Amino acid sequence: MLTWAITRAGYDVPAFAKKFPKILEWLEGQKKPTVKQLEEFSKKVYLPFGYLFLPQPPQEKLPIPFFRTNGNQADKIGINVYDTILLLQRRQDWLKNYLKDNDFPPLPYVGKFHNRNNVKEIVADIRQTLQLPENWASHFKTWQEAQDHLVLHIEDKGIITIFNGIVENNTHRPIPVDECRGFVLVDEYAPFMFVNNSDFKSAQMFTIVHELAHIWTGHSAGFDFRRLQPANDPIEI
């Protein structure tokens, strides 16, 4: 279980032992950890403390499909991306329940093009819903100004947009751009978009537009967009 927890956090044992030397004594059976030491260990590897007492490692599945530019769906992602997705799913669940309990209607554009993949038609509907004229971005001097304007229109329609490059507010847990440029959690009441703000502004705009298309087609997903190309997958094309 200890080795699994270390690997899950993205370390190998020798590298982790440099940060946490006592782990070698535990793995070799020379000493047994105290409860306090196990609590410290669980924090180092970003693992719920109770997991350490399970008879075997739990089967953790990706919470959403995660597309790689090489055409494959990932079967594993880094722990920082994984934890960020779970964190935002919990926030989304709370907001969705709040909106439903207070009789807010579902958002009509979510999944509107679920069985259609006409890109021009989808883009036109997105622009119409967000009330953006053609070539709207050309009226702004910088990518930041254009992005601020776009996000204002997006959030006005009920889409939650989060920009972050770390897990919550933990600066020791960065989210690498080459692993995750963003992800979208589709829901008819509370769609969430996450954008890695460690990325270039132009790349962030690409991610935002791509995530909007996923909301309109009704598919949650994460992306790496290496070389700013979508994955070779029917959902992505």
Regions found by a protein language model. Give the residues of each.
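Short juxta-domain linker segments that transition from a proline/glycine-rich
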Residues: 1-237
